[in-house]
Curated annotation (Swiss-Prot):
Record InterPro entries: Adhesin_operon_reg_prot, Fimbrial_Adhesin_Reg
One CC-aspect GO term: cytoplasm
Any GO BP annotation: regulation of DNA-templated transcription
Record-given protein name: Major pilu subunit operon regulatory protein PapB
Localization of this protein: Cytoplasm
Species, as recorded: Escherichia coli
Pfam families (UniProt xref): PapB
Annotated function: May act as both positive and negative regulator of pap transcription. Might positively regulate levels of papI and/or mbf. Its autoregulatory mode of action involves differential binding to separate sites.
Keywords on record: Activator, Cytoplasm, Fimbrium biogenesis, Repressor, Transcription, Transcription regulation
């Protein structure tokens, strides 16, 4: 059974399938990463650099946690937040047209 999270805003609820979105090491471009960080609540330079090394650079979780002296549990929590945010952004993307993209 898939894990779902219900997000409710102004009485409108929808299901967001968390497992549809997976962020693997090295799976993200630098532009995609910084756009995602830009809409996140993550502000720590150390945490941002750790996530960048993992998601863009393809470094292992162990390497990143050691390099940035990050607790593995905090790494998992932060990565989970980015996974949920990425899934939400992917669900929102069809509502925006190609003409509205300033980065193409």
């Amino acid at each position: 059974m898939a894990h779902h999270e219900v997000i409710s805003r102004s009485g409108n609820a929808f299901l967001l399938n968390i497992r549809e979105s997976v962020l693997l090491p090295g799976s993200m471009s630098e532009m995609h990463f910084f756009l995602l960080i830009g809409i996140s609540s993550i502000h720590s330079d150390r945490v941002i650099l750790a996530m960048k090394d993992y998601l863009v650079g393809g470094h292992s979780r162990k390497e990143v946690c050691e390099k940035y002296q990050m607790n593995n549990g905090y790494f998992s929590t932060t990565l989970g937040r980015l996974i949920r945010l990425n899934a939400l952004a992917a669900r929102l993307a069809p509502y925006y047209t190609d003409e509205s993209s300033a980065f193409d």
